[in-house]
Design a protein with these regions (language model features):
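Active-site core of glycosidic bond-cleaving carbohydrate-active enzymes
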Residues: 2-169
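Catalytic-core signal marking the mid-to-C-terminal active-site face
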Residues: 172
Length: 172
């Protein structure tokens, strides 16, 4: 139940590989862009068959080995390299289109999974070392993700006034 690219005539692109980077997915793959329904997480949950199936798919992002198909680019782009080095399955935090994904556990009534993975990402991908900052900054998104997440909330849907609770680093 992953998103697929379509041709101009409305047909789905074939063959389909959820691990193929590029083509229909800019600097990412279907495992990353499937979650980009910022405006309607409940609709995506329903489309996937409910909370249990949705959470299973979210879990799969972290358990699918960090393998990839780079045939569209013809070489390993830095976003792919960053994903494989972080060794968190197909979760590619260094590329912004997936950064909101962990917060989607909240919509499926499993906030403890969001809290667990948020802390994993903060502890593993943001460290006070020369290589302790993952991926691109891209207009401040990567540092904004960290600041929001450290404060304990995040705007999953840009432009809305809704924030989703996470795992704050501060007790007060």
């Amino acid at each position: 139940k992953l998103m697929r690219g379509k041709k101009e005539n409305g047909e789905f692109m074939k063959p389909f590989s959820p691990l193929k980077w590029g083509d229909a997915f800019t600097e990412g793959n279907s495992w990353h862009y499937t979650w980009s329904v910022f405006h309607d997480p409940q609709g995506l949950i329903d489309l996937m068959g409910g909370d249990k199936a949705f959470v299973s798919m979210l879990d799969s992002v972290f358990s699918v080995p960090p393998v990839f198909d780079d045939s569209y680019y013809g070489f390993v782009i830095h976003e792919i390299r960053e994903m494989t080095v972080m060794n968190m399955g197909n979760y590619a935090h260094g590329n912004q289109p997936i950064q909101h994904m962990i917060y989607l556990y909240n919509y499926a009534k499993q906030p403890w999974k969001a809290q667990y993975w948020l802390r994993q990402v903060m502890n593993k991908m943001y460290t006070p070392t020369p290589d302790g900052y993952c991926g691109d900054e891209d207009n401040g998104q990567t540092s904004a993700w960290y600041v929001f997440t450290a404060l304990g909330f995040y705007p999953v849907c840009p432009g809305s006034n809704e924030y989703v609770v996470g795992a704050p680093l501060f007790k007060k």
